[in-house]
Amino acid sequence: MDMKRRIHLELRNRTPAAVRELVLDNCKAMDGKIEGLTDEFVNLEFLSLISVGLFSVSDLPKLPKLKKLELSENRIFGGLDRLAEELPSLTHLNLSGNNLKDISTLEPLKRLDCLKSLDLFGCEVTNRSDYRETVFRLLPQLSYLDGYDREDQEAPDSDVEVDSVEEAPDSDGEVDGVDKEEEDEEGEDEEEEEDEDGEEEEDEDEEDEDEDEDVEGEDDEDEVSGEEEEFGHDGEVDEDEEDEDEDEDEEEEESGKGEKRKRETDDEGEDD
């Protein structure tokens, strides 16, 4: 991917003025030059151009707030005066793995008054026996060269690395180069996932309740069936008893009628 295209993607619908950090590592610099980077990036504090195939920084725009510049693993051999002209706030510069052969190529860096840390690992200039003493003498403002101070004491991390960009939102509502809208979207996604989990739990609870109700319903039906059977059985018994009672009543009535007839016959005999 070429550098222009990469910058366009990194903007993510932001304005250049809203960008504080820009990482363009491993993209392709056409003709070995910087492309697509303009002086509209007025608030840029960190720029990384590692292994992009740069031969020169002659097209670097003015970036008044840039503090850290990563240019390692390129093919830069000179033209560092451009850095002194366009980067007045630069504190950390990494030129490791470039084609810097002579101490004289570093002289333009004397004008970078804020420069505290310089890295030249893998550059041919480091092969000089008096390399460190010469560079510290040439650049008295330096605190650390290749991660060590003048007394060969290793630099603390806070000095080697640029402090993280403060997380205060800018005028566009962005934090650390990330759109506030993107953070909101992530929050919404998390809430949706929580809601889905809650709904699943509710569904499970409802299913359990339905199962319990079904079981209770079956028990009630069993009880009702038992009562009906018992009631039905009792009903049959009652009907049989009623039939027996009716038979007895009929027998009694017939017996009574027979006695009455007998008495009437006896009475007639007496009259005769």
From Swiss-Prot:
| Ranges for the LRR repeats | 18-38, 43-64, 65-87, 89-110
Q: Which residues carry this modification: Phosphothreonine?
A: T265
A family per Pfam: LRR_9
Q: Where is this region: Disordered?
A: 149-272
Q: Which UniProt keywords apply?
A: Chaperone, Leucine-rich repeat, Nucleus, Phosphoprotein, Repeat
Phenotype of null mutants: Deficient mice display a highly penetrant perinatal lethality in a mixed genetic background and a fully penetrant lethality in a pure C57BL/6 background. Mutants also show enhanced clinical symptoms correlated with depletion of naive effector T-cells, exhaustion of lymphocytes and enhanced prevalence of follicular T-helper cells. In addition, mice show significantly reduced H3N2 or H5N1 influenza viral loads, inflammatory cytokine response and reduced pathogenicity compared to WT.
Q: Where is the composition biased (Acidic residues)?
A: 149-254
**Molecular function per GO:** histone binding; RNA polymerase binding
**Modification(s) after translation:** Some glutamate residues are glycylated by TTLL8. This modification occurs exclusively on glutamate residues and results in a glycine chain on the gamma-carboxyl group. Directly cleaved by caspase-3/CASP3.
Family statement? Belongs to the ANP32 family.
User: What is the protein's given name?
Assistant: Acidic leucine-rich nuclear phosphoprotein 32 family member B
Instruction: Give the originating organism.
Output: Mus musculus (Mouse)
- Name the gene that codes for it: Anp32b
